[in-house]
Amino acid sequence: MSNILILDFGSQYTNVLAKKIRLLSVFCEVLPWNTPLEKILQKSPSGLIFSGGPHSVYQNNSPEVDKEIYNSNIPILGVCYGMQLIARDFGSEVQGGKSEFGYTPIVFYPSELFKGLADQDAFHTEIRMSHCDCVVVPPKDFFVIASSQHCPIAAIECPKKKLFGLQFHPEVSDSQDIGDKILSNFVKHICQTSETWKIETIEKQLIQGIREKVGETERVLLGLSGGVDSSVLAVLLHNALGDRLSCVFVDTGLLRKNEVEEVKQQFSSLGLEILVVDASEKFFHDLSGIEDPEQKRKVIGAAFIEVFDEASKNLDVQWLAQGTIYSDVIESAKSCDATQVIKSHHNVGGLPEKLNLKLLEPLRFLFKDEVRALGKVLGLPDVLISRHPFPGPGLGVRVLGEVRREYVEIVKNADSIFIEELKKANLYHKVSQAFAVFLPCKSVAVKGDCRHYGYTIALRAVESTDFMTACWPSLSREFLNRCSSRIINEIPEVCRVVYDISDKPPATIEWE
């Protein structure tokens, strides 16, 4: 099967790049930059990409690759730091102080990499630059194929070795049309890949992989959340294992309004029997007094495991299945030691060392949009597939600070009002995710001519294609006013509503 490997040097866009390549129907995997050459070659990659990163190639102990990789006859594309690394490894000098940020005029020259952009003549356009270092002179046998005013060597190629370098990021949305064309040229034409990464193929591979891993007699326990990921996984596992799957839905007390009944009805219609366990007392007890977001996630993850472990004693199961997806792994920073931890995912960072069940994560290398596409192939109803993402820790990370029952009830009702109004205004499917956040601080208000102290609710909505980056939508004043009025009037404890206008980055989508 055709495949592209990305060696990750710590760029915040590495996984966006991987998703872009998969959209070309070619499998792409992200590996740490220091992956041994032998392991890389064992995967028989059709092409390699060196990602960007926060380092400078002239610094001591900067990340580098085994130089034998250049003799492998595998096409290589270096992006930003990756280009500078290739240039340095072939004898060129890289210097700092030549920074460019934002939209920059650039000229593309004829190259196989720019097929369809600069076939005969130079192509003038603008591209988004974000770099502090520049290649001073092209290495021997390399040609300059793009230039900007402050970066004369903005792209390079060595046709003989099929080595290419870009000083800019083709994967960022600002450069989408041009960037997509460049990536397509590299992946499809230079690497000569075939379109083998398709949802129908993925479904068959996942089912086969599940059966091989679990064997013919062992059983699997799945913790349902009611979200897209666990719902898709439930049907996938049922198709693979039949009645050897046991589904447990844990009522943590941290779920959305009416979620327990909705989940029972949805899965009953899919022919899946589920066991509902009310563990809300345990979760609130374990979270008592804990304010740190990271600690809350770990406590919630540990509590899930304890509940599942107890349930498994009566179900004769050997495996615990989780709906971990690629973005969960990414945000927990397990793909590259040059990346800093943003937040632990409860499925990833919160697992205790001693796990009495073997872990099964079939969706671990799928992005959210791929999970949704898989759900359609599996026949899940749109109401499940198109539902907004909900964090594994639930409302536990939408109550800032200590999690208390009364706080959860407040944010649960506020969230329900917000979602209801979005659906009424036909906005629910126009935003990628929306929810309410409880702020445990009181402010002064006036209700019924009396002085009143009440809590604050923050409303959060984002638009995103991959949830690695996101922007806030400009919801109308009239719409926000309706939401605010209902929340303040229908929830006595609330006296103030604010709307979050923070993009990701720098903010994350969830507040905790």
Curated annotation (Swiss-Prot):
SUPFAM superfamilies: Adenine nucleotide alpha hydrolases-like (SSF52402), Class I glutamine amidotransferase-like (SSF52317), GMP synthetase C-terminal dimerisation domain (SSF54810). The keyword ATP-binding applies. HAMAP family: GMP_synthase. Catalyzes the synthesis of GMP from XMP. It comes from Chlamydia muridarum (strain MoPn / Nigg). The lineage of its organism: Bacteria, Pseudomonadati, Chlamydiota, Chlamydiia, Chlamydiales. It catalyses: XMP + L-glutamine + ATP + H2O = GMP + L-glutamate + AMP + diphosphate + 2 H(+). This is GMP synthase [glutamine-hydrolyzing]. The gene is guaA. Homodimer.
